[in-house]
């Protein structure tokens, strides 16, 4: 007899050991580190490599605060403004090949990012559409099960629609504000570049000045001018010509203040009324003084300074005829051309010789009229027969 059977017979109760326990499952290996995303823009040096852009130019662009992501998000017009600022602020000689090379590098990088992110974006958009469709189906199923839309649901949906409308209007207002800031920055850079060109030689064209607008920020409301006689106060909410000429005297005082502060700090002081003077005037509260308006009537102020009697007579004549200020402004050109004829049609010398006009740039239109008068005078002199002796 087997001893185990005897033990089993003597002790009917014993532990049932059962099958052996399985071995513990080893933990899964840690996931590999995620690869760097391929749709991230490269550094600016890598982006322009091979496109003929010098490293010194890249360094200047970086000093202005531009990165590769910023340049990729900019439009062609904004790129032109950036290059103009680079040439105006740093006096940097940007080569023609560098301009085209930078644009070509940005186009290539945009194409690379679009090709890399297109597939991933398509996958995400598909899953997003599926999720949205599932939500719509679940909402319809709940509505069908409950027998329609209740009053509470209707009220909540109306409130949600109002909130979305408010969010949309706020987003549109924010977009307009950002666009206005960009336009103001672009205008400031264009004005700075125009002043640099004026200092090198010659003033800016009147069409550019009139289309440039009033500069950044909101100004106080400026009422229109009317033709008034000397000493006459304009009625209603309008300003007379004496007030207009007073603005030019204020600009001269602001220029003196800017020059004294520049000398005090050891900076280069302007010799003419530039954007620096207009910005200072706005800073001290004289926001009614702006560059387009002052450049628009500078030849009228010149006639007032050079020949005050002729200016007063012209004002009285146009006031008696009921002409507007635009017609009076155009009529101020002819006396100035006659004055320049006494000095060899050199209107720049006429401005430079007068202490109150030397701080203003000669309008391009006035310079053109003097040049045409000089040409006509020379042609008429050449057509005369020689004297007989």
Curated annotation (Swiss-Prot):
The record marks 268, 275, 279, 326 as: Interaction with DNA. GO terms for biological process: cell differentiation; flower development; maintenance of meristem identity; regulation of developmental vegetative growth; regulation of DNA-templated transcription; regulation of flower development. The keyword Lipoprotein does not apply. Disruption phenotype: Several abnormal phenotypes in the vegetative and reproductive phases including short plastochron, late flowering, small panicles, reduced meristems size, aberrant floral organ identities and loss of floral meristem determinacy. Reduced panicles size is associated with reduced number of primary branches due to the precocious formation of spikelet meristems. It is found in: Nucleus. One of its GO terms (molecular function) is DNA binding. Interacts with APO1. Belongs to the FLO/LFY family. This is Probable transcription factor FL. The lineage of its organism: Eukaryota, Viridiplantae, Streptophyta, Embryophyta, Tracheophyta.
